Amino acid sequence: MTQFSTFVQTTTHKTLEQLSDREIYVQLLNYVKEISADKPKNTAKRKVYYISAEFLIGKLLSNNLINLGIYQEIKAELAKAGKSLSHIEDIDPEPSLGNGGLGRLASCFIDSMSTLGLNAEGVGLNYHCGLFKQVFKKNEQHAEPNNWIEENSWLIPTEISYEVPFKHFTLTSKLDRVDILGYKKESKNYLNLFDIQALNYNLIETGIEFNKTKIKENLTLFLYPDDSDKNGELLRIYQQYFMVSNAAQLLIDEAIERGSNLHDLADYAYVQINDTHPSMVIPELIRLLTK
């Protein structure tokens, strides 16, 4: 494995001492992604699909450095250059994909399954603004969008895309992935995050209030959008169906790639439904299999 300082010099033609904390963060993110890209995927005939509306995965930089077994090494390299790893960790935005115990449970499962070397992946949605970000203005609490996705992020784009049919329109998805590294393992799994193609941030009005009727443009804006009215209720259902349809189509495609004739699908896939949000995957799988 190339030393981080050598990686930085090769990619930037600068030393660690010459870079700002943010520049070091970007280099460290790319360094970790390069290492994880070389790791093979866990494989097996049968695969677990852990479908969840949320994944509270925490900050990924420190977690990935620990799982790769290089945390102390990086800390020492940075200290030698007069830099603080803890300051750089503060720059790393936490993916705003979860809220509480449900999301933390899901994250613990996909973390553990990767460490155990199981062929098992999470499937969810890529919420661009999360639940909300709490800020204080003039001694008052306000909720604002938590725009956590930066130009340089842990998301890995793919070419995978599916058509999800609704009553009056069809949405085309796109899939981004996050590498889930097991603790000191030479293999990895993925967290699969589905998204819409035409997200529109301009639908956000004040705080976290937004136009909930434009489903084609708002579906993956927020985690758990306000469902106190009819439009909010419908948006939640649209989100859940979009998630499970993509998950089911991914499951079927991957099972076929591994040799399934679909009559033996149970020998190729397990589905873990995390709470009620993904429960529509059952009728959706039946719909797809009877087409």
PLM region descriptions:
Residues M1-K291:
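A conserved ligand/cofactor-binding region detector
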